């Protein structure tokens, strides 16, 4: 009996030891121990879309934890709501459940209210929202109170490009619309391409009899989609000769509205449009607007699928193009610490190599040749991002 009791105790102790080893290993490997013991600084960030995979990347977060002792919490926000809703965690169903319930009952809260869960930083996915947040809120338009901005800037960048196919690009080269330089394809006459679309030219008019219908570049809807708005901002800049002014915007909006109408059906998200481009091929989507990062992300996440289509794919760089810049806005010292960390060279390399973001980090070495497609080392021909009021006028006119 005593022998059995000792054996049972031994088994229990052995099991407890195994569990303890597993727990210790888990905490060590995942840096959870540092979080639980307070060795990591938790930083809360209101975050726009388009960079979720990068922010969740295991290697990125390991650098943040190991090198900078940061546990970053990125809450998902739409860009527009960062202006109109109180920038507190409770606005997106996080933080204090008591305050969430009271907000649901109609009670109003702001960043100045007692007990709310505040943010250390804002990470928008569009520069116009970064620039606009730094201004005083327009209370008459229903804008919410804002944090004091301590620092910030452009952190992740990717240019607008047009994805197409070999046969289409060959035809555009013959039309003197596209030029190839060192294996990179540039749309050197965007005005001519815009005119072709406005004139209703057909694909068959440029020697592509296998394609049905009029020449078109598919995009997301600028009225409801930030990428679509960025693209139409580029078109407006091109039509305005590179400099949008109060006078020429009114002259060019009717032409842009005509372009918008002729574009027909539009996808809701760039991810849906890019997937359709890949799945339906040249017959379904001869040309689409997207970000440069999408193809690099696809090449890394789905190498087998990428290898099947890469010989037929062409990336066209409009000259000029426009940057889509994800901007980091610092509200607190903790936010400043994360901002510094995101400018780390190693994190910058991951941002480019795995997700296609250009960070502009000094010392960053981008091996564009490794992608196997025509991607330029640097992009110099760009237009300035439009201000919020210009975008608002553009979008209102298109509705």
Map each language-model feature to its residues.
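A conserved helix-loop-strand patch within extracytoplasmic ligand-binding domains
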Residues: 138-223
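Ligand-binding "clamshell"
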Residues: 133-150, 298-316
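Early extracytoplasmic/lumenal segment of secretory-pathway proteins
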Residues: 24-140, 146-148, 291, 296
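Extracellular/periplasmic juxtamembrane helices and adjacent flexible linkers that interface
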Residues: 2-25, 331-399
């Amino acid at each position: 009996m005593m022998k059995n009791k000792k054996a049972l105790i031994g088994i229990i102790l052995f099991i407890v030891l195994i569990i303890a080893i597993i727990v210790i290993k888990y905490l060590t490997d995942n840096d959870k121990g540092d979080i639980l013991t307070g060795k990591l600084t938790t930083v809360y960030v209101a975050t726009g879309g388009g960079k979720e995979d990068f922010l969740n990347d295991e290697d990125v977060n390991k650098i943040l934890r190991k090198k900078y002792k940061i546990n970053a919490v990125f809450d998902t926000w739409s860009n527009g709501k960062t202006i109109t809703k109180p920038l507190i965690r409770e606005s997106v169903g996080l933080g204090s459940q008591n305050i969430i319930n009271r907000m649901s009952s109609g009670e109003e809260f702001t960043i100045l209210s007692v007990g709310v869960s505040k943010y250390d930083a804002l990470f928008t996915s569009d520069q116009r929202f970064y620039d606009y947040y730094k201004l005083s809120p327009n209370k008459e338009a229903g804008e919410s109170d804002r944090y004091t901005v301590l620092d910030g800037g452009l952190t992740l960048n990717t240019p607008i490009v047009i994805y197409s196919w070999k046969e289409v690009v060959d035809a555009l080269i013959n039309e003197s619309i596209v030029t190839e330089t060192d294996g990179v394809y540039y749309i050197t006459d965007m005005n001519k391409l815009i005119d072709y679309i406005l004139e209703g030219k057909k694909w068959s008019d440029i020697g592509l009899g296998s394609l049905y219908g009029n020449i078109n570049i598919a995009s997301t809807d600028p009225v409801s989609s930030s990428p679509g708005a960025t693209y139409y901002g580029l078109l407006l800049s091109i039509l305005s000769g590179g400099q949008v002014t109060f006078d020429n915007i009114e002259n060019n909006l009717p032409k842009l509205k005509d372009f918008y109408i002729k574009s027909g059906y539009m996808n809701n998200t760039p991810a849906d449009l890019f997937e359709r481009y890949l799945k339906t091929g040249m017959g379904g989507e001869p040309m689409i607007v997207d970000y440069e990062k999408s193809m690099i992300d696809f090449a890394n996440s789905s190498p087998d699928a990428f290898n099947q289509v890469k010989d037929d794919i062409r990336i066209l760089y409009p000259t000029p193009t426009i940057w889509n810049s994800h901007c980091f806005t610092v509200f607190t010292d903790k936010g400043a610490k994360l901002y510094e960390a995101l400018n780390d060279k190693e994190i910058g390399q991951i941002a480019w190599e795995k997700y296609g973001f250009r960070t502009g980090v000094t010392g960053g070495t981008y091996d564009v040749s490794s992608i196997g497609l025509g991607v330029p080392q640097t992009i110099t021909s760009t237009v300035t991002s439009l201000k919020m009021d210009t975008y608002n006028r553009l979008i209102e006119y298109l509705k």
